From Swiss-Prot:
Tissue: Restricted to the neural retina.
DNA-binding region per UniProt: 148-207
UniProt keyword annotations, A-Z: Developmental protein, DNA-binding, Homeobox, Nucleus, Sensory transduction, Transcription, Transcription regulation, Vision
Signal peptide: none
Compartmental location: Nucleus
GO annotation (BP), single: visual perception
Motif Octapeptide motif per UniProt: ranges: 37-44
Keyword Cytoplasm (UniProt): no
Family: Belongs to the paired homeobox family.
Stated name of the protein: Visual system homeobox 1
Source organism per UniProt: Carassius auratus
Amino acid sequence: MTGREEAIDEKPKVKLYPSFGIDKARLNGSGFRSKGFAITDLLGLESDLQPHQSGSGAGANGEGQSAALGGFAFPGGSLPIGLGFLCSLAAQQPPGAPCFLPSHIPLLQPRTESHFMQNLEQQRDAYSDDDCLSGDRNDGKNSQKRKKRRHRTVFTSHQLEELEKAFHEAHYPDVYAREMLAMKTELPEDRIQVWFQNRRAKWRKREKCWGRSSVMAEYGLYGAMVRHSIPLPESIINSAKNGMMGSCAPWLLGEPAGMHKKSLEIGKNPPGTPESTHSDSYSEEHKVKDSDTTWSSGANGADDSEDMAIDLSSTSKQESKSTLKRSPPHTEDSSDSETES
């Protein structure tokens, strides 16, 4: 008999432990699950491989080697591949058995260590390439964002001149004014809006020093100083004398009755001094006297007109009486003259 026939005849010699029952519901492709805690039990290997000596040793091909490997016989010449199989071989191998090497198994020969390492290197390379691609994409996106943020417009002298003129006219131009500037300067409207924002920030920063504050600060600070008769700093007065009227409030140091001059005049004669009170009382007395004289003169004029009216009426009455007294004799004379005739 050949080695193949011996392997076929020896199929029913494989036995199972009677203490472990087979659960058909838990049957898997890898084996059966048991209740033990050994490595073979945890890995699902419940069959005990019985050692068997090869018969004549005539099988020189691969099938004969697989049937009589290390003193163990396998049914059908098939070799179960797995960690449990290797562990069972190591545990049940007799001391006189030859050394077990993976090269003895033809199914394990393609999966050598070098091939496994090559596969790992390929996987690592593929993973690293994906990471590099994703990192490059992220870097590209970040660089695009940075480029957009760092994009700056270079203005020409003509554009700056037009923008400065518009800024002196109005610090907050409307949409129509910005569109007109865009047509003049050939700039986009959003660039003009950003330029005005930066220009206002620069102006506010420069106007923070004395005499260059904003309008609210001028009306608040200088108004309080004028109300309380606080002298202004010499720097502002000197700048106004030197002609730097743009550096201070024009209504504060202007020629036509500036508030600073008024505050100086009030400061010379403060309202709490006796001179100022005397002058105020004297002016009030004069005003009262003038009003009294005007009222009395008006009353006297009215009385005179009434007296004149009364006198005129009395004279008219007297004249009428005299005419009545004189009229009868005249009538008698006329009657006498008529009779004589």
